[in-house]
């Protein structure tokens, strides 16, 4: 999963085997390789059910699940880094609880996702490219951190979490 986040967050300009395969098959490159830029996260979902409407719903659900997993992995990574950096046991407990609490806000974060593209393959499979702006999840995670029940010693930690979310998601491409 961590590799998937790295793949989503890293930009590359070399043609990949996925893009070569996509060109060969006559389908959009993003179906195989997703899309990458520094404004947000992208995820691809696929569905092939009895009709296009339910196939699209399935594809959107799969892509949103992938977005949720990417955000969760990123939040856990940021939080673990801060937990490792903090010395006080109380702050460590706060960060662990905040990380768990932030995972619960995934639905609010995903409400900011949008369909960026869709493709219907010759075999009837519907592919959907979903996009989640970084500003959406940084805002939601910061909101969650600021409303979290905290002690005075944890206020500093809360501030560091907000800074870490902003820094991580605005600098990783």
Regions found by a protein language model. Name each.
Residues 1-14:
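Sec-dependent bacterial lipoprotein signal peptides
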Residues 11-173:
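Domain-level marker for long, solvent-exposed, non-transmembrane regions
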């Amino acid at each position: 999963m961590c590799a998937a986040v790295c793949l989503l967050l890293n930009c590359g300009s070399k043609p990949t085997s996925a893009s070569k395969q996509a060109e060969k098959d006559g389908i959009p490159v993003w179906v195989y390789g997703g899309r990458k830029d520094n404004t947000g996260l992208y995820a691809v979902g696929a569905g092939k059910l009895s009709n296009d409407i339910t196939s699209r719903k399935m594809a959107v659900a799969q892509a949103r699940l992938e977005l949720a997993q990417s955000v969760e992995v990123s939040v856990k990574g940021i939080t673990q880094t801060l937990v490792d950096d903090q010395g006080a046991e109380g702050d460590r407990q706060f960060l662990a609880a905040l990380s768990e609490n932030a995972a619960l806000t995934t639905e609010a974060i995903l409400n900011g996702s949008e369909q960026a593209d869709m493709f219907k393959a010759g075999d009837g499979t519907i592919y959907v490219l979903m996009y989640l702006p970084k500003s959406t999840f940084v805002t939601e995670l910061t909101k969650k951190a600021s409303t979290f029940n905290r002690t005075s010693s944890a206020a500093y930690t809360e501030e560091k979490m907000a800074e870490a979310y902003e820094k991580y998601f605005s600098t990783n491409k």
